[in-house]
Amino acid sequence: AAALTDPYVLVFAFLIGMFHWTNYWDFVIYYVMGGMGVIWCNCQNYKELEKPHRMRMTMGISLLHAVWVFLLANIAALPFTLQFQSMVSEVALAQNHSRPYQYWLIWGLPAIGTVLFFWCVKREGAKKADAFGVLLGISALGLIVIPEIVYVRDIYEKEYARSNTMFKLTYQAFTMFGILFGYALIRLWMEKRHVIRKILTSVVFACFVGCCFYTVTAVHAWFGQVWNPAQYQGLDATAYLETTFPEDAAAIRWLNEHVTGDPVVLEANGDSYSDYERVSAMTGLPTVLGWYVHEWLWRGDTGALNERAQEVEAIYTSTNQEEVKKLLAIAV
């Protein structure tokens, strides 16, 4: 009972349960990662027992934790999942794979640095602080390998089958590698007894510093001459409206200042990453139909989307006054 009511276990279950309504991919990722952490903790808790009994206790309690956390996480997510319809169809074997040189261009440095860290831990013996680093490394390596083996089938199946799986998993891998490197490079550099390992660490660190220069290129590519005050853009995402759509900018300010509640804003529907749906985006008010592809991705079915898109278009283009009034009554 004490193992199930541990505050850390309860908080962990609730927090990963939140991933159901923020990003379900992260629920799977951190459920597995957290499970590995729980197994390690249980190994430490029962390390004084004899080996056969220690293994049984560790795996038994870990399995109990796994079931309990999964149950609590799903209970925490019930207010969302009871009304949610997933767009995922199934998991399939990957038919396309990354080209080796492209794969290693992106992941070679963090993978080599991680393996070097594992080597150090194995040869010198693991310190208590190494456990989290090892957990991050194993998880990150697994996340960059999985999309080369399987992927989740969704609306991108025909043209970009692995794109969503690759993005969701490797994004988390990138984050884990970044956290790991902050610890691993210092851990490796402080090792004084192994000259070869220190040389390899220096090479990895030099490559890492070289990669940091990309930041300068990226900033200039996105924002131009940042040192020129005349080209300052700032962090205000609505600023472009003042020059591109000044009338809309004024309307958005008025809505933000005067409208209360959640009335529906009717806007023409368009593609993702465009100027469509700008009023609902900048005010937070609901609209009849958001960016088409995003709405499709969240639902996996275009039937209702096409119907709504046609109705919105009819409201703006129809010459039949009665039809427009009827559609407005339904939509807004």
Label the predicted regions:
Residues 6-12, 127-156, 202-212:
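Transmembrane alpha-helix segments characteristic
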Residues 10-22:
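Membrane-interface alpha helices of multi-pass inner-membrane proteins
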Residues 1, 70-74, 78, 94-124, ...:
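Alpha-helical transmembrane segments at the extracellular/periplasmic loop-to-helix junctions
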Residues 216-332:
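Extracytoplasmic
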Residues 9, 59-74, 188-219:
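Signature aromatic-anchored transmembrane alpha helix within multi-pass, membrane-resident enzymes
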Residues 2-6, 46-59, 119-138, 192-199:
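Membrane-interface helix-loop-helix junctions at transmembrane boundaries of multi-pass membrane enzymes
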Residues 83-105, 146-176, 229-231:
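Membrane-helix boundary/interfacial segments in multi-pass membrane proteins
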